[in-house]
């Protein structure tokens, strides 16, 4: 039987959150893409559920934040309970969960399948991406003699479609492949990469329940450390559910027999850890168990043609709720780079930065998870959490929120030599949430909400006090230089920069008509663009670490700062951009 043959720009193997975020980028950038998934349908119960603030910023950039927050459960408070050696269970602490500094969201919870559905619905609005279920990848061959040809399709994949009568096979030729196929990644095995790390004897159960309980903090994010008995961690979920993590075995105990784990055992252990309070299970929607292991793939890319993202790269426990977030951020880092290369806008060498930027994040994820498991094990032996561990847990909060990532690959990040506060505008870190007021309308925005994920680079000009003639002249000179950079460096297919200006003058002291055209342009169809000039709301310069003289900040399509310089430093900005857009010379 002759196999059907086809060609595609990008083949994504796996339609979980990591694969779908990669597909979202391809959809936004118009890249012909197929997503294949062996499951017959999206995940309906169970799976990951934690959403950290950085993921919400990503969702907003794609335009799906409101759909997420309409159905999620925000984490509004935390409680810590401990049982001492005498068997007494008491609350040690209870606190509200504040929104992180310079961010619009705190963390929240939503079942993975619902997140997948929301992303899929937005992808389906774009014709360039197709998602196929019940499709299995059977073989992968990389034609190495075609790697240096930009328009070649060197990745040859055999797909088996199990949804057709009797099954059928197809030969797909792809320019690039993304393996988002989970911890047992088929793609990783085809590439010959190995998972390096350790498997522990720590065993946990996880279950989603509808319960009735007299426990006072049942609707908070609650940790219970029970002396000599194990730990319990639970969180309020959507639709009246509660997600419970139940410790069945510590890492320092003898091997726990996995075959003995049942739904009844989990509920019995849960009820025992809550005593003297009662808990009645009205419905069990899902349960599972896992032995904790920490593994990291020894490779993430092959020839910069096949890429691994998410659990295909890093394995850990689901206890701290970071896995889905880090997995999506892997794809958020890769997607714009891959789309830009395919559109012949970006230098193909940019693809090498995926592994150099994301491997340190994966390693940090595993260390963070290892620490939290150690924290649980120690607390259940002693009945309390040691002070040094609590201090370190506090220090890890930026990592837990997704804000500790600091990229340092020199192709995309020009490091600053000046001392900066941790939440300032720093090359390599995500651009923070800073509130400004639209000059024309007075409407308040967070600058970050203006940085949409469409594959464009963003230029943010902190202009200073434009009521001063010298500052206005510097600003307009900068605007003219930016227009020249657009014409000389940016590929025509990319269009223009997303330009945002933030000044410190009174609104009545300047008129938009006095500004360079790039800050107040005219479109033949939509007319004047009033959405480029904003006023500082008294503190945004200080919060950003920007001085009175202002600055120019170049933000990548994924909202990370690439370069920061003085308003007059056209040469510095040009020097940053040229290696990235070098492909224009060959387009």
From Swiss-Prot:
A molecular function (GO) term: FAD binding
Transmembrane segments: 7-27
Compartment(s) where it occurs, according to its Swiss-Prot or TrEMBL record: Membrane
Residues annotated to bind FAD: 245, 311
GO cellular component: membrane
Pfam families assigned: FAD_binding_3, Phe_hydrox_dim
Superkingdom as given in the UniProt entry: Eukaryota
Protein EC: 1.14.13.-
Subunit structure: Homodimer.
Similarity field: Belongs to the PheA/TfdB FAD monooxygenase family.
Protein name: FAD-dependent monooxygenase ankC
Provenance organism: Aspergillus thermomutatus
Phylogenetic placement of the source organism: Eukaryota, Fungi, Dikarya, Ascomycota, Pezizomycotina
Gene that encodes the chain: ankC
């Amino acid at each position: 039987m002759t196999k059907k043959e086809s060609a595609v720009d990008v083949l994504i193997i796996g339609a979980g959150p990591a694969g779908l975020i990669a597909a979202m980028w391809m959809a936004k950038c118009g890249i012909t893409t197929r997503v294949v998934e062996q499951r017959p349908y999206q995940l309906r119960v169970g799976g990951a559920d934690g959403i950290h603030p950085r993921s919400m910023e990503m969702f907003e950039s794609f335009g799906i934040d409101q759909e997420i927050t309409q159905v999620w459960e925000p984490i509004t408070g935390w409680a810590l309970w401990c049982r001492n050696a005498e068997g007494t269970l008491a609350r040690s602490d209870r606190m509200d969960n504040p929104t992180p500094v310079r961010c619009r969201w705190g963390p929240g919870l939503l079942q993975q399948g619902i997140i997948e559905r929301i992303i899929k619905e937005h992808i389906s609005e774009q014709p360039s991406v197709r998602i196929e279920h019940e499709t299995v990848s059977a073989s992968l061959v990389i034609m190495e003699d075609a790697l240096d040809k930009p328009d070649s399709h060197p990745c040859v994949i055999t797909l088996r479609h199990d949804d057709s009568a009797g099954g059928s096979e197809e030969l797909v030729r792809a320019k690039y492949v993304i393996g988002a196929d989970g911890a047992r990644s088929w793609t990783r095995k085809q590439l010959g990469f190995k998972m390096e790390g350790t498997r522990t004897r720590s065993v946990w159960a996880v279950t989603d329940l509808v319960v009735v309980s007299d426990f006072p903090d049942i609707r908070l994010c609650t940790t219970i450390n029970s002396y000599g008995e194990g730990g319990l961690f639970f969180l309020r979920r959507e639709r009246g559910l509660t997600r419970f993590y139940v410790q069945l075995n510590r890492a320092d105990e003898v091997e726990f027999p996995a075959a003995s784990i049942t739904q009844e055992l989990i509920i019995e252990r849960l009820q025992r850890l809550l005593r003297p309070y009662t808990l009645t299970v009205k419905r069990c929607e899902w349960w599972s168990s896992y032995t904790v292991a920490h593994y990291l793939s020894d490779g993430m890319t092959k020839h910069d043609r096949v890429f691994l993202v998410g659990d295909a790269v890093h394995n850990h426990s689901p206890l701290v709720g970071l896995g889905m977030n880090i997995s999506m951020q892997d794809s958020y880092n890769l997607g714009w780079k891959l789309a830009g290369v395919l559109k012949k806008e970006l230098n193909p060498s940019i693809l090498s930065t995926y592994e150099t930027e994301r491997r340190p994040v994966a390693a940090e994820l595993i260390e963070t998870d290892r620490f939290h498991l150690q924290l649980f094990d120690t607390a259940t032996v002693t009945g309390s959490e040691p002070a040094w561990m609590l201090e370190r847990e506090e220090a890890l909060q930026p990592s837990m929120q997704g804000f500790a990532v600091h990229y340092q690959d020199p192709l995309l990040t020009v490091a600053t030599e000046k001392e900066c506060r941790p939440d300032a505008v720093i090359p390599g870190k995500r651009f923070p949430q800073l509130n400004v007021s639209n000059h024309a309308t007075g409407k308040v925005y967070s600058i970050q909400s203006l940085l949409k994920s469409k594959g464009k680079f963003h230029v943010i000009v902190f202009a200073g006090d434009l009521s001063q003639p010298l500052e206005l002249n510097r600003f307009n000179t900068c605007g003219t230089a930016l227009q020249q950079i657009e014409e000389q460096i940016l590929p025509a297919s990319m269009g223009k920069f997303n330009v945002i200006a933030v000044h410190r003058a009174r609104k009545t002291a300047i008129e938009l008509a006095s500004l360079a055209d790039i800050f107040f342009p005219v479109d033949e169809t939509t007319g004047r663009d009033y959405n480029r000039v904003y006023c500082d709301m008294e503190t945004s310069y200080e919060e950003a670490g920007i001085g009175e003289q202002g600055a120019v900040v170049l933000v990548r399509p994924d909202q990370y700062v690439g370069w920061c310089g003085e308003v007059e430093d056209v040469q510095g900005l040009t020097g940053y951009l040229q290696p990235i857009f070098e492909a224009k010379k060959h387009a």
